[in-house]
Amino acid sequence: MYNEFAPTADTLFLLVLSILTLESVHFIRFLYQHFLSGITTKSLNTFFHACSYAKVDYSHFMNITAKVALRMIPDSLATQPIFLCVDDTMVAKAGTRFENVSKLFDHAAHNGSNCLNGHCFVSIMLCIPVWKNDRVSYLSLPLGYRMWQKKAPLNQTGSDRMKYIPLFLYSFRWNIETSYYEQKTFWSLCRYMVRSCKGIEMLVNLINICYCAMTKALKQLIRQQVY
């Protein structure tokens, strides 16, 4: 089983390594020109192919991230609640060459309209209790993304249920928006040039793994070692 998927796993590992090293993903060609071509004989097309056609379920990445996050919960906070937050974010893309690109409503669009041309990603975030400055705080780690498709309508029941959610939980919303902003601004989440839905989802989730490792999990592990 390992030998069957070893070449693909190796290629995806190199992609993750390049993202961690450069801390940016302008596009796969950028990763190849500035890092990958210097450490491997694999061709540029190999990395494009791995993203779009690899027989790898990236939900395994989400499971690993969740396991790492759960291990970071201190024993003294083992009885505290854990939260799963689901939200969506928009990514504007020009033209129609990307799979599943469509006109989307975005209340935060800054283009003079409430609509943008692009993709909608639904994300799930795990919020775990940790100690911070001798107080219980929640560390939010995005587990992964899935691209919303037109044939699957968005749930419209959320607004009716909002009044039942305690006000203090709104703080999680800030963590979600901060995560989106950081990934889009500093980790080039919006700059993917892969065209297929599967390829886009694979690359976006690889970026998310690196983001969690470098800015969330590592920082918390260092804090636990210090204190």
What does each of the following model-derived ranges do?
Residues 86, 90, 166-197:
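Short amphipathic alpha-helical "interface-anchor" segments enriched in bulky aromatics
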Residues 1-165:
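Conserved, well-structured functional cores that handle cations and Mg-NTP chemistry
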Residues 189-227:
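Basic, amphipathic alpha-helical segments enriched in Lys/Arg and hydrophobic/aromatic residues
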Residues 27-28, 59, 73, 77, ...:
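Residue-level signal for secondary-structure boundary elements
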Residues 140-142, 170, 225-226:
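Short intrinsically disordered coil segments
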Residues 26, 42, 174, 178, ...:
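Generic recognition of stable, solvent-exposed alpha-helical segments in well-folded globular domains
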Residues 18-22, 170, 196, 200:
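Generic amphipathic alpha-helical segments used as scaffolds and interaction surfaces in large
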